[in-house]
Amino acid sequence: MIYTVTLNPSIDYVIELDSLNHGSVNRVNEENIYPGGKGINVSNILNELGYKNIALGFISGFTGKYIVDSMIAKNLNCDFIELSNGFTRINVKIKSNEETEVNGNGPNISEEDLQKLYDKIDNLKNGDILVLAGSIPSTVDDKLYENIMKRLEDKNIKIVVDATKNLLLNVLKYNPFLIKPNNHELEEMFNVKLNSIEDISRYAKKLQDMGARNVLISMGKDGALLLTENNEVFLSNTPKGTVKNSVGAGDSMVAGFIAGYLNTNKYEEALKLGAACGSATAFSNDLAT
């Protein structure tokens, strides 16, 4: 079974307008509401590709109920822990002459709630796949991903991590099956400017040397770069199209990679499907279908 973890899901309220004028009333041209969160996005695309999975994480309040109802309507399996306080956050994404995001904080997560998540994680079996995606809420120990991976290190579980900076660097010692930073996140991790594919490849190799089995670097319009545990290097170009939406493209790439690998057991084919899924979402108003 494939499991995804979204610690701080959201309702994404996406609005489009010609221009955003601060200090005055603005009228939108179009508005949509979507369940959000990197792990939830991965679950959505995996389901579209025919791979049943279970979404784990935390929800709360009326907004959390909306997320669950939306996922059930799409025949997505979820096993969220319902918190007794607050409400699942609402993120406002404004698309005008430039994109602006206003993200909520989310509810408090107690130690008791965390233990409920650990109990679910402990039930994973050999051969399962676990996707840890996104940020960790400020109310939670920033070692949470490390703690999860430590609990599973004696099991044969493929763990995929899509996180930034120290959240990612600190789990490499547990040899994740796949990590997927983008090129900008790679620059931030090493405090460098990467000007070429060769530069990106060199620093991706550093992540591999630190413990990651496979390193997938998404590069926006420049495609994606994959370094495999078999010492292979693959580069995928991006199909031509009009970019309508950057939200969820990286998550779609992760889902496509997992599905492609399960389909063929070949990393090159996994990259191809991952890149195709990422582009499909980028060329859509919402996640690809």
Where do the language-model regions lie?
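Conserved N-terminal subdomain of the carbohydrate kinase-like
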Residues: 24-25, 48-128
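Charged helix-capping and loop-helix junction motifs
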Residues: 115-118, 142-149, 195-201, 236-239
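Gly/Ala-rich phosphate-binding loop of Rossmann-like dinucleotide-binding domains
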Residues: 47, 153, 262
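Short beta-strands and strand-loop turn motifs
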Residues: 101-103, 128-134, 162, 180-185
